Regions:
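Non-catalytic C-terminal accessory region of glycerolipid acyltransferases
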Residues: 96-262
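Generic preference for hydrophobic
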Residues: 26, 40, 63, 171-173
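Catalytic core of membrane glycerolipid acyltransferases/transacylases, capturing the structured
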Residues: 3-11, 17-21, 34-92
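Membrane-proximal helical "anchor" segments flanking the first transmembrane region
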Residues: 1-39, 238, 245, 253-262
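A generic local structural motif
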Residues: 24-28, 48-50, 99-101, 157-159
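A generic structural signal for well-ordered alpha-helical segments
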Residues: 16-17, 79, 106, 138
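Thr-Gly-centered strand-to-loop micro-motif
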Residues: 27, 64-66, 88-89, 117, ...
Length: 262
């Protein structure tokens, strides 16, 4: 079953990429294979990120996804078969409990975890605040973290758009970060270190440990998953509070043909 699943993941990645016309320009590809199992953390801009990560990791993976993805045609069942854990982002404590089987999968089955520490797609190219869930898993499993920095997947499928467009996405796979000496006591420092590695690679200003810890609290209310969920149920539009951030949203390429996979 495991070999069949690995084959299905690779086949899906290759077939979907060919249909879309998606090419990957990857620097540091060797870091994908130097240490397994690992926790592959990626910054989340687009629905295309799932396809990108499947194309890169290819085998023996488990993942975390928002509960809403479970009901998507094609992608939802495939993610479920691949062992993706679907979480309710509005219930923090339940989400933490749901992630516990991931540690067992990594330790006993030697599978790698694929996770977006931002917890949701960023509405702009600016890196969002990091949640601690993946870092707690790293502490419990003692497996290394491999940062996967995706630069422009929003060009392929901007947030809010179900159409995938052809193009080249640039990716940096950074060297593995060991976690064997990590503890809950220094988790804020570790989150800041990993997030700053992303910021450096993206060409964005780094933050101190204190600034990183404050970033989640300072996230505009209408960008927080739990608030977005309440607004959606009420029929209200979700948008960034700061209008200046809207200018950095990757533009939709009008008139270019695309394909809908969702």
């Amino acid at each position: 079953r495991r070999d069949s699943l690995n084959f299905s993941i690779s086949l899906f990645a290759e077939t979907a990429s060919a249909l879309i016309g998606l090419d990957l320009d990857v620097r540091g590809r060797e870091n994908l294979w130097k240490q397994r199992p690992a926790i592959f953390m990626f910054n989340h801009q687009s629905n295309a990120d799932m396809l990108i990560m499947a194309s890169l990791i290819r085998r023996d993976i488990v993942g975390v996804g928002k509960r809403e993805l479970k009901n998507l045609p094609v992608i939802g069942p495939l993610m479920g078969a691949a062992g993706v854990v679907f979480i309710d982002r509005s219930d923090r404590h339940a989400a933490i409990e749901t992630m516990k089987p991931l540690v067992q999968a990594m330790q006993e089955e030697k599978k790698s975890l694929v996770i977006a520490p931002e917890g949701t797609r960023a509405p702009t190219r600016k890196l969002g605040a990091f949640k601690k869930g993946g870092f707690h898993v790293a502490i419990q499993s003692s497996v290394p973290i491999v940062p996967v920095v995706i630069h422009n997947s929003g060009d392929i499928s901007p947030k809010g758009d179900k159409i995938f467009r052809s193009g080249t996405v640039h990716v940096d796979v950074l060297p593995a970060i060991e976690t064997t000496d990590w503890s809950v006591a220094n988790i804020d420092e570790r989150v800041a270190d990993v997030r700053n590695a992303f910021l450096r690679t993206l060409g964005q200003p780094e933050l101190s440990v204190e600034e990183t810890a404050m970033a989640r609290r300072d996230t505009p209310d209408d960008l927080k998953p739990e608030v977005r969920g309440r607004r959606k149920k009420a029929g209200l539009k979700n948008s960034a509070s700061d209008p200046s951030e809207q200018d950095s949203v990757p533009p939709k390429r009008r008139g270019k043909r695309g394909i809908c996979l969702l």
